[in-house]
C-alpha cells in the first residue's frame, strides 16, 4: 500500500472515529469508557498520520 493510500485510509478512519465519538457523546447517558477508548484510538490514528507525513517529506 502506498503512503498516499495509507494516509487516505487513516483519514477515513479518523473521520469515522470522530463521528462515533460525537454519536456517543450525544446519547442521554454517554459511556465514558467507550468515549475514552474511541478518543485514544483517534489519537493513535492521528499520530500515525503525522508519522507518515513526516516520512513522506
Predicted features and spans:
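Extended, charge-rich alpha-helical interface modules
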Residues: 1-57
Amino acid at each position: 500500500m502506498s503512503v498516499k493510500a495509507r494516509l487516505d485510509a487513516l483519514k477515513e478512519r479518523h473521520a469515522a472515529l470522530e463521528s462515533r465519538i460525537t454519536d456517543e457523546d450525544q446519547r442521554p447517558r454517554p459511556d465514558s469508557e467507550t468515549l475514552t477508548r474511541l478518543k485514544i484510538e483517534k489519537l493513535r490514528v492521528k499520530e500515525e498520520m503525522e508519522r507518515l507525513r513526516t516520512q513522506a517529506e
